[in-house]
């Protein structure tokens, strides 16, 4: 559904030629396509020291269906360790057939007839035959992606909301007040107050609860009364959302922040970098940023690992990096 909303599988694929010749790269020849030789792939994968996973999407075999642009899962693999090899694979899905390796190393068929749009994570979760599927599924589910917080007048974060204990801020920030109060009541009140003071010196944050609905008030130096969440500037509200996300009492294995500098005053970016650096001690944090100020502030933190991306002939690339410069990775074939 997510791919369909953005134009289907073709919108997620490289729109340039299958291969760029040296003459094309130098500008000596026009960039033009050729007859495609390799199958269409959209491949995603990740690995750590314990487990790795890869999925390979492709187009269906042309037929009478009008859904010929729906992606199909051609291959899924789970393996032990950081690099896939046939000997380290523990779960292997090829088309509709799924095999899992048993305790003695022999392969057992655990599913035959899996739908082309169905992942092993949604259809198979037997802890006896393939515990790695269940383990990896729960690990992925715990990841958090914060892409864009709305701050317009109708934004959920600006409205008082029914609240319960909230150890994880929702993606739309609707439970902001409950999330901040949860942080305070679980023993991190001083850390919360310090994060607010680092960005807004002299400010004091208060969570209100009336008839089960939670709201926010922020008292600031120079003002005769605290401001409610509906009155806060876009930047102030968004910064409070980042505080709630990064001070979570339940840190994930991976948290991705997409352009957290949006709507923030440049003076807030050093404080945001310190907040991110502190959170990275409890979770792996990926930050996608375009602000030189935020990037410089993050680089000043000892744990920062900067990866610069550039655009070359329409492609996203790592400048000065070749195939041998990246981490060792092997894609399972079809």
Give, region by region, the residue ranges found by the protein language model.
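Short, Φ-rich (hydrophobic/aromatic) sequence segments
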Residues: 1-2, 136-140, 180, 240-247, ...
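Conserved P-loop NTP-binding catalytic core
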Residues: 1-62
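Electropositive, glycine-dotted interaction segments
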Residues: 41-43, 47-186, 190
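Short, mixed charged/polar active-site loops
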Residues: 50-54, 224-226, 315
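Conserved ABC ATPase signature
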Residues: 194-247, 254-270
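A cross-kingdom feature that marks ATP-driven nucleic-acid transaction machinery
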Residues: 227, 231-238, 246-249, 256, ...
